[in-house]
Amino acid sequence: MQGKAKVTSFDKKPGFATLRAQFPPGSVAGIAVGASVAVNGTCLTVTQQHGDELCFDLIVETLRATNLGTLGVNSCVNFERSARFGDEVGGHNVSGHVHTTAAISDIEVTPSNRKVVFKVPQALMKYILPKARASCVAPRPWFAP
C-alpha cells in the first residue's frame, strides 16, 4: 500500500458504477488514462484524471467480488500504483485478482499469538492454499492487543 485516497463520488447504476477518488498531492503525478491502480487491492483502470482526482469504472464482476460496491462518499481506500522498473520491492508480494470477500468468523487468542479464521465460500476453498498470502482491508484499528 502506498497511501490512502478519499472517495469524492460513487455513481452506482444497475451492474455498473463509477468511483471518483481524491489522492494525496503528487501521488498520482505522471499517471495517464488507461493506467492501472490497485484500489483496496483491486486492479482498476483510470478512466479520467483531474489533477490528483482519478475516476474508475467498476463492472458488475468487480462490484460482486470486492468490497468496492459498499463504498460511499468520504470512504477511505488503500491505493498502490503499478510497480515500475527500478522501484524497491519490499515486504511480501501478493499477486493475482480479487475473486471474493471473506468475513472473519473467529479469532483465537493465545498468550503469544492470534489465529484469524475467515469464512470463504465453499466453492472457492479448493483455491485456498495453506500458508498462502491474502490481502486484507480492515477499518482502523487494524490490529488490537
Give the residues covered by each predicted segment.
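Conserved loop->alpha-helix
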Residues: M1-P145
